[in-house]
């Protein structure tokens, strides 16, 4: 279920501050964050944000299509490598 529009978007204050500083200084350095729950806002377009996936920070370039999504959607936490190949020897 989507968040109500009357509530507005959620973004952690420390991340919002880092985004404001990066926009003002036109910094190209990735912004490290552990806040996967924060929503992507229009101010973030063009920034690279390194989102923590539980093990490492995954760099993600924010584009216009990502607005309204959560940061965590773009840094997968699980790596599926497929099922093991069964031994094909006859029984």
Swiss-Prot record:
GO molecular function: rRNA binding; structural constituent of ribosome
GO biological process per UniProt: ribosomal small subunit assembly; translation
Pfam families the UniProt entry points to: Ribosomal_S19
Keywords assigned by UniProt, alphabetized: Ribonucleoprotein, Ribosomal protein, RNA-binding, rRNA-binding
Covalent S-S links between cysteines: none
CC per GO annotation: cytoplasm; small ribosomal subunit
Gene3D superfamilies the UniProt entry points to: 30s Ribosomal Protein S19, Chain A (3.30.860.10)
Function (record text): Protein S19 forms a complex with S13 that binds strongly to the 16S ribosomal RNA.
Family matches, as PANTHER family: RIBOSOMAL PROTEIN S19P FAMILY MEMBER, SMALL RIBOSOMAL SUBUNIT PROTEIN US19M
Assigned protein family: Belongs to the universal ribosomal protein uS19 family.
Name the UniProt record assigns to this protein: Small ribosomal subunit protein uS19
Organism: Dichelobacter nodosus (strain VCS1703A)
Lineage start: Bacteria, Pseudomonadati, Pseudomonadota, Gammaproteobacteria, Cardiobacteriales
The gene coding this protein: rpsS
């Amino acid at each position: 279920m989507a968040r109500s529009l009357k509530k507005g978007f959620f973004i952690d204050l420390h991340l919002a501050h880092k985004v404001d500083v990066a926009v003002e200084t036109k910094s190209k350095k990735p912004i490290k964050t552990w806040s996967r729950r924060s929503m992507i806002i229009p101010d973030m377009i063009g920034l690279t944000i390194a989102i923590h996936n539980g093990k490492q920070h995954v760099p993600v370039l924010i584009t216009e299509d990502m607005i309204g999504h959560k940061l965590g959607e773009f840094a997968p936490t699980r790596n599926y490598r497929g099922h093991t190949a069964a031994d094909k020897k006859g029984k």
